[in-house]
């Protein structure tokens, strides 16, 4: 199991499930005398002061009880504040377990729109999120529809916010990146920055992964230039400790600067190459094929993929219209696929070509050709078998856990059609 795929499992498992899977249950990580970390699918941080506690991110609803249990012995006095670095489910799922009477919950102002956006499209996202981890989910049409989220925060801010608790000053900054509501927490006394998911620890210690500049499950654009600016804000603080939403602490300003600068520069490179290609008239698929990270960045694609990021940047700037008049209309290309099968003399020649493509190391072209056949006959067994082979080939050769999840989903669907288990 790759490290990236192993981390992905933790996003849906608590301590007990992790132990049953053969992974060692996590233990509390002490950062300093005041800061502890529960290293679960998403890290949960506890900052203790003489006047009470501050919790930074709360984990998923599944692993939040484990985080609360892990940190229980470190909690002395009331939980005065909960700070949410952003509104993703793996960071806000444990709010109710930490919230007490009088607890203030802090978020950046764009939090409201983010969680409402997710609630608004719950029926759309639920099966896509489940498919990413090859998990069962209700069909989209079975969701009644939910257009407003529960809003837990009691304090919102735009650009900056600060408070002092027990003599410890907490400074909060708006740092959009993975989400528009993303914030960074800076504790000057400890020279420590909590930066949420604007830096991911997937693949650490080395090599780490390129970020997920676009989430293929479906999301609004993640603006690369905002993300770059946010990393610059963190670097300008000259932190000695950086604590992220996933992965291990980074200590020492030199190492922090090296890692975050490389991370930032890789984002800048992919953004600039995409824009350069757009301005030279290249289409999105050409750029997805052409743009590769130089080896100097030493980043894997176990979490974010460069090709997905290229398309996310391209479509974020330009939208869906590709200047082909045919795409202005509601008729999809698949409407003529049955005609192509008929012109080919039936499905058999198309399936043969699909298998030839697979033998030539072109499994994605195999998938496209099986799409053509299955549009004419969704139960065509040779096409389903060719599709299963192509999906299995891609699954065997990917290092990206998100890609692996959707491939597993596709493999399962093909096997179901074939009656195989």
Predicted feature descriptions by range:
Residues 25-74, 184-198:
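Conserved beta-strand hairpin/beta-sheet module of binuclear metal-dependent hydrolase folds
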Residues 4-16:
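Bacterial N-terminal signal peptides
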Residues 30-31, 53, 58-62, 113-174, 219-238, ...:
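Metallo-beta-lactamase
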């Amino acid at each position: 199991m790759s490290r990236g795929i192993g981390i992905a499992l933790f996003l849906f498992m608590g301590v007990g499930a992790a132990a049953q899977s053969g992974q060692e249950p996590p233990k509390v990580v002490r950062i300093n005398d005041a800061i502890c970390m529960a290293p679960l699918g998403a890290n949960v941080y506890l900052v203790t002061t003489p006047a009470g506690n501050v919790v930074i991110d709360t984990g998923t609803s599944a692993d939040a009880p484990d985080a609360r249990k892990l940190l229980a012995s470190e909690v002395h006095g009331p939980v005065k504040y909960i700070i949410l670095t952003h509104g993703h489910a793996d960071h806000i799922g444990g709010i109710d377990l930490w919230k007490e009477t009088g607890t203030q919950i802090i978020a950046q102002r764009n939090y409201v729109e983010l969680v409402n956006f997710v609630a608004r499209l719950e029926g759309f996202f639920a099966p896509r999120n489940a498919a990413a981890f090859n998990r069962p989910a209700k069909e989209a049409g079975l969701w009644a529809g939910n257009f407003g989220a529960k809003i837990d925060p009691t304090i919102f801010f735009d650009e900056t916010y600060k408070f002092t608790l027990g003599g410890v000053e907490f400074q909060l900054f708006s740092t959009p990146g993975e989400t528009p509501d993303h914030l960074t927490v800076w504790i000057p006394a400890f020279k420590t920055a909590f930066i949420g998911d604007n830096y991911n620890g997937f693949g650490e210690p080395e090599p780490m992964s390129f970020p997920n500049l676009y989430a293929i499950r479906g999301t609004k654009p993640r603006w690369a230039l905002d993300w770059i600016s946010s990393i610059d804000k963190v670097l300008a603080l000259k932190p000695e400790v950086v604590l992220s939403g996933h992965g291990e602490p980074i200590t020492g300003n030199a190492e922090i600067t090296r890692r975050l600068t490389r991370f930032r520069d890789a984002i800048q490179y992919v953004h600039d190459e995409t824009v350069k290609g757009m301005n030279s008239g290249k289409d999105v698929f050409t750029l997805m094929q052409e743009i590769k990270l130089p080896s100097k960045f030493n980043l894997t694609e176990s979490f974010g993929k460069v090709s997905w990021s290229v398309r996310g940047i391209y479509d974020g700037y330009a939208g869906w219209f590709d200047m082909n008049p045919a795409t202005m209309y509601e008729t999809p290309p698949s409407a003529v696929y049955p005609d192509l099968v008929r012109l080919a003399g039936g499905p058999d020649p198309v399936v043969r070509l699909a298998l030839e493509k697979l033998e030539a190391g072109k499994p994605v072209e195999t998938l496209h050709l099986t799409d053509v056949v299955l549009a004419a006959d969704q139960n065509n067994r040779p096409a389903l078998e060719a599709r299963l082979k192509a999906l299995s080939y891609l699954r065997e050769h990917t290092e990206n856990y998100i890609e692996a999840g959707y491939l597993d989903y596709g493999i399962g669907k093909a096997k179901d059609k074939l009656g195989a288990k």
